């Protein structure tokens, strides 16, 4: 598998979903020679699955300040104000930018873009294109990438980052990535002169019932983690209340936004009748609705002990066809239900990772030259619970900021600090088993951290890249050599324990059990082997590499969930049914310290540009 | 057979071929050993029948790998999968791969008909595997790669030609004029959005191109997906007349709209129900109008 090829660009963007494409366009506008490296062809990215819409305060009567207020409240006061304010201030401009690029938004009579209500918003500010907003956004942006002639290396799986070796991660810098060309099996270095932007999307495959694509294995998060970048607030996973029971395919919040109603097995409109959200009912925020549904099912008022009904028939065929047509197709194709004639079965499913790679408001991580944007990142705009329609603006706003920053444009000093410095606080955390990789024994070497394994400090960028490439070549050789456990077995063991123990409802005992199961899965991964010997399109190998990422992420997620002994947003803890602002107005951060995960905290920033967001009780 | 297996065609292909001159390397030997082991496992799986008594479906799956001895000669493998209500062709393939043969290769990602990566030839028709219910198909289910495309491995085809044709129609929005205020929309009427709406739904799956007889015979024909993309912009009122004329010129070229013989096969297979043939006809009409204006 010898290869000497190195590709060189100013800025390398990893991932071609909404975040990656926007970042690439921005970097190019700022004058950089930019390339996108993506394991899927851009139009196959999961952004295409987004349905509901993009929040942007673009109408009279609305303001970005109100949007920021709603977002902070929705986050259960775990968002950082500088990031939230950037999101809400920039979203109108970025949304209209999409319109200027031709995006096929739904329209009002006067030709302006339509908006609709979404859960947790005080104004109907969700801009949309039918129930296929993500598809329209992804394609529109890819078109602009084609127009600009930005180079795309598609079906190249990025395996690792080329990061220098200093002891303290905040002293490290990133000089590129190592890619694996799926078609040919070639491993090559991608040298980034100015910066690497990770935009690898979600990590839904950690769970078995998810709205996410099969490719959403959290690769970027895991790579950054192993290179020493902290992961922030990993315990906050959004479970969407309306997914189809058999597949996890999402039924957009747009259905409830348009007036869809939830019923339990007894035909009761339970959101009101059982007092879960007396004001907002079905439009309460997602965590509230997901818990309500499961409570109904657990208390015997579900249907077939599994799901509840979402009814949109009363909206009438015209309105459904106009605004929710795609939902009819999804219900029909994937559940065999005609939404015009029958209510649709729905249950909660993993949907979105609020946590991820720790960044500041410009997408910078604590490693110099390394950025992260989109769902893989945590600039801390969603805190403990993301509002529907707030992820797509995140892609375009932070995609643009990171692209410009990486290309060398001047910015003000960031207000959000990254890395283990400043006012952090060490955690007192006890795990039931040894975590991380150490216990795996001597072989652990082969799947070691980026360039950060404590050897002699190499600082020459080309040499750093070369070391990283060699390490991946060796890893692939070894994986192909060994004829061991199939990755699919390990992956499903992880998914099972996560679904059983780290789901919507969580308790200490189950979380500990999950860590024990994950330890076992990690040990089995030591014996993983790839049985397909081919260099052509070896998906066996790819899935094996992804499974390693799933393992690391699942562990960090569970650690965070065990440590945070309070009830906030999407994170429900049986032992502690209150939001504990006194002790927990802080982010959990987990960093990989030479193979050992290390947990610590940092206070939330509630101080905005002109005001402080005072935590209030969140009621809907 | 309807599928084309590459015979070491283009240069890039050749570059990735193992060097025949060299001594068999450690890697080659290893690969050989692996192939043997894989064959062994396959034999074992075929002998034991863990699914006896269950409601099963039989898949006949096309196999080919230019790298692996024993798979260089295309063939069909049989897999038996337990059937559950609601199971799709993609679910069945995943089951077969994860349970019997981890080298079974196909593209897939969203499993909800939006990423367009799993178009295949199933029981004689182009379909998205994730959107096709097993219960709608007769047994055995025959699964092949998209016809009229080069096969890379098993069910994976080379999409480059499809992407190139897409590129050829300048597939991006080019507004006539933009509002000066960056917070103001350029606006589009509801009626115009309706006109282009269906055309914007394309997920680039390639099913239409693969089903088209004309495209099969004429490699340069732009094909239904690219023409649909051209329609999407040519009919968008925001682009303005002169850009529209340029777009019509592109699709009027020798291998453009006039090649379409309205056989409707593209329209039949499109998983997004895009009225492709109609869009192509509409473009022909526009082209005629355009010419009348000038000649
Ligand atoms: C079904 C669904 C509906 C949603 N609806 C909405 C909505 O209505 N409104 C809203 O605001 N949000 C919505 N969301 C959330 C939002 O769509 C996602 O958070 C967002 O699209 C993620 O975009 P991204 O660019 O970060 O990642 P993605 O679009 O997932 O892109 C990830 C990219 O990274 C690449 N990649 C991954 N790993 C590697 C690797 N190792 N090497 C190279 N490339 C790699 C992939 O190829 C891909 O191109 C929805 C999410 C889902 C799942
Ligand atoms: S037009 Fe239809 S069949 Fe053709 S590529 Fe697009 S979605 Fe697929
Ligand atoms: S898997 Fe995405 S279209 Fe079928």
Q: Which residues does each predicted region cover?
A:
Chain A
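Conserved N-terminal glycine-rich FAD pyrophosphate-binding loop of Rossmann-like flavoproteins
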Residues: 40-72, 76, 249-253
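Conserved redox-cofactor binding core of oxidoreductases
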Residues: 94, 101-186, 193-195, 199, ...
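An anion/pyrophosphate-binding glycine-rich loop and adjacent beta-alpha core
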Residues: 229-337, 405, 446
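N-terminal Rossmann-like FAD-binding beta1-loop-alpha1 element of flavoenzymes
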Residues: 10-36
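Glycine-rich loop(s) and the adjacent beta-strand/alpha-helix scaffold that form part
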Residues: 195-249, 382, 388-405
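Short beta-strand to alpha-helix junction loop
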Residues: 79-92, 125-143, 153, 210-218, ...
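Core beta-strand elements of the Rossmann-like FAD/NAD(P) dinucleotide-binding domain
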Residues: 6-9, 184-195, 365-369
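Glycine- and aromatic-enriched mobile tails/lids
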Residues: 2, 18, 26, 30, ...
């Amino acid at each position: 598998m010898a290869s000497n090829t190195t590709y060189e660009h100013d800025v390398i963007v990893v991932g071609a979903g909404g975040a990656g494409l926007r970042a690439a366009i921005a970097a190019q506008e700022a004058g950089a020679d930019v390339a996108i490296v993506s394991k899927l062809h851009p139009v196959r990215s999961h952004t295409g699955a987004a349905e509901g819409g993009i929040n942007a305060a673009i109408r009279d009567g609305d303001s970005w300040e109100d949007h920021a207020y709603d977002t902070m409240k929705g986050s259960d006061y775990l968002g950082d104000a500088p990031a939230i304010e950037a999101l809400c201030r920039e979203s109108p401009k970025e949304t209209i930018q999409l319109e200027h690029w031709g995006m096929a938004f739904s329209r009002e009579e006067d030709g302006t873009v339509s908006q609709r209500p979404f859960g947790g918003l005080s104004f109907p500010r969700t801009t949309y294109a039918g129930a296929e907003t993500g598809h329209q956004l992804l394609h529109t942006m890819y078109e602009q990438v084609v127009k600009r002639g930005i180079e795309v290396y598609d079906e190249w799986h990025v395996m690792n980052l080329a990061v220098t070796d200093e002891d303290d991660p905040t002293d490290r810098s990133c000089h590129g990535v190592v890619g694996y060309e799926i078609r040919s099996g070639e491993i090559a270095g991608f040298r980034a002169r100015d910066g690497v932007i990770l935009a690898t999307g979600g990590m839904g495959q950690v769970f078995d019932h998810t709205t996410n694509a099969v490719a959403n294995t959290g690769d970027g998060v895991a790579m950054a983690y192993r290179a020493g970048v902290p992961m922030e607030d990993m315990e906050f996973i959004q479970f969407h209340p309306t997914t189809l029971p058999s597949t996890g395919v999402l039924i957009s919040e747009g259905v409830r936004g348009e007036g869809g109603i939830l019923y339990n097995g007894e035909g009761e409109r339970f959101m009101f009748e059982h007092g879960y959200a007396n004001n907002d009912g079905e439009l309460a925020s997602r965590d509230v609705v997901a818990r309500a549904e499961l409570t109904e099912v657990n208390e015997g008022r579900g249907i077939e002990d599994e799901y509840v009904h979402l009814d949109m028939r009363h909206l009438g065929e015209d309105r459904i066809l106009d605004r929710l047509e795609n939902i009819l197709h999804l219900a029909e194709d994937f559940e065999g239900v005609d939404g015009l004639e029958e209510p649709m079965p729905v249950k909660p499913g993993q949907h979105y990772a609020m946590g991820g790679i720790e960044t500041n408001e410009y997408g910078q991580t604590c490693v110099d030259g390394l950025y992260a944007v989109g769902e893989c990142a945590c600039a801390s705009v969603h805190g403990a619970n993301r509002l529907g329609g707030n992820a797509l603006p995140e892609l375009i706003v932070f995609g643009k900021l990171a692209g410009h920053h990486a290309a060398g444009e001047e910015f003000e000093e960031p207000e959000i600090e990254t890395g283990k410095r400043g006012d952090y606080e060490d955690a007192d955390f006890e795990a039931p088993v040894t975590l991380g990789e150490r216990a795996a024994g001597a072989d652990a070497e082969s799947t070691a951290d980026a360039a950060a394994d404590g050897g002699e400090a190499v600082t020459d960028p080309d040499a750093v890249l070369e070391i990283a490439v060699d390490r991946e070549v060796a890893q692939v050789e070894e994986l192909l050599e060994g004829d061991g456990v199939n990755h699919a077995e390990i992956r499903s063991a992880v998914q099972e324990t996560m679904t059983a123990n780290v789901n919507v409802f969580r308790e200490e005992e189950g979380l500990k059990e999950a860590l024990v199961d994950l330890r076992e899965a990690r040990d089995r991964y030591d014996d993983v082997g790839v049985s397909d010997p081919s260099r052509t399109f070896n998906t066996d190998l790819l899935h094996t590499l992804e499974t390693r990422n799933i393992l690391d992420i699942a562990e960090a997620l569970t650690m965070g969930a065990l440590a945070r002994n309070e009830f906030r947003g999407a994170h429900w803890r049986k032992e502690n049914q209150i939001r504990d602002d006194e002790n927990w107005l802080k982010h959990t951060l987990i960093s990989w310290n030479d193979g050992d995960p290390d947990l610590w905290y940092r206070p939330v920033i509630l101080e905005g540009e002109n005001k402080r967001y005072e935590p209030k009780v969140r009621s809907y | 057979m309807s599928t084309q297996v590459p015979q070491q065609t283009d240069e890039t292909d050749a570059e990735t071929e193992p060097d025949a001159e060299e001594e068999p390397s450690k890697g080659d030997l290893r690969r050989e050993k692996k192939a043997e082991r894989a064959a062994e496992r396959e034999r074992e799986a075929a002998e034991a029948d863990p699914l006896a008594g269950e409601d099963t479906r039989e898949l006949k799956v096309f196999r080919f790998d230019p790298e692996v001895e024993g798979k260089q000669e295309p063939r069909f493998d049989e897999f038996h999968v337990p059937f559950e209500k609601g199971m799709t062709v993609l679910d069945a393939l995943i089951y077969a791969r994860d349970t019997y043969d981890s080298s079974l290769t196909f593209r897939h990602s969203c499993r909800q008909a939006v990423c367009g990566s799993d178009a295949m030839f199933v029981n004689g028709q182009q379909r998205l595997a994730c959107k096709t219910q097993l219960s709608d198909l007769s047994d055995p289910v025959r699964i092949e790669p998209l016809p009229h495309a080069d096969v890379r491995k098993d069910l994976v085809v080379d999409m480059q030609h499809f992407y190139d044709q897409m590129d050829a129609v300048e597939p991006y929005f080019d507004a006539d004029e933009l509002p000066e205020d960056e917070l103001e929309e350029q606006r589009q009427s509801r009626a115009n959005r309706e006109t282009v709406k269906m055309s914007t739904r394309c997920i680039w799956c390639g099913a239409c191109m693969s089903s088209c007889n004309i495209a099969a015979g004429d490699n340069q024909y732009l094909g239904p997906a690219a023409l649909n993309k051209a329609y999407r912009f040519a009919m968008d009122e925001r682009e303005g007349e002169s850009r529209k004329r340029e777009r019509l010129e592109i699709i009027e070229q020798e291998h453009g709209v006039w090649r379409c013989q309205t056989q409707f096969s593209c329209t039949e297979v499109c998983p997004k129900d895009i009225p492709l043939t109609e869009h192509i006809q509409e473009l022909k009409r526009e082209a005629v109008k355009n010419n009348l204006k000038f000649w």
